[in-house]
Amino acid sequence: MIKYMRHIFIFIVVWLAAGTICSFAQYKPDRLGEGFEAKTIAMPDDYSGKVVTTLVRSLSSCDTHKAVLYVHGYNDYFFQKTLARTFNDSCFNFYAVDLRKYGRSLLPEQTPFEVRDLQEYFADIDTALTLIREEGNTDIVLMAHSTGGLITSLYCEAHRNDLPVQGLILNSPFLDMNMNWFYEKILVPIVSAWG
């Protein structure tokens, strides 16, 4: 009898856990309104605790296997409905990722934008690309703005031998500090060494 009860208990725990994980990872209507859905995905914890990333999508009415994944910049999140609609009208499924500790992915106890290395965002991009492919998209282009341009450029460089996307579109990428010679070669190294 005890063995039978133990099996029932284990079944109930597994069933509840699976239901919780599945309900957490389902698309739900997004704050952008009609035609936009968001899915929040639990990621492995980092040095500050729990981490999530959020995938927002707007699907084209065309029968298409093409998609764009948009990566926002610093102190930002995805809100550009017109951008998504423009890609949808051009027969692209549109996706955007709110990176960990930004926008929809910022949890109450977190410090906004806190990462120690930009490569921490690669897991968010990999997760988004995997989900986009699982939804039947085979031709995927990354698009990024500002610091997202720096992150995606580093991502593509790190994956140069097995690039998981067909292209990269950069919108006003943050690739350089744009300082004069004195600041860049003299002042910044002194201030950096000083701490």
Each language-model region and where it sits:
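Conserved alpha/beta-hydrolase
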Residues: D76-A84, N88-E109
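Bacterial Sec-dependent N-terminal signal peptides
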Residues: M1-Q26
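Catalytic nucleophile-loop/oxyanion-hole region of alpha/beta-hydrolase
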Residues: Y74-N75, G103-D139
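Short beta-strand element of the alpha/beta-hydrolase
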Residues: H65-G73
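N-terminal cap/lid segment of alpha/beta-hydrolase-fold proteins
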Residues: F24-C62
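Alpha/beta-hydrolase-fold enzymes
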Residues: T147, I151-G195
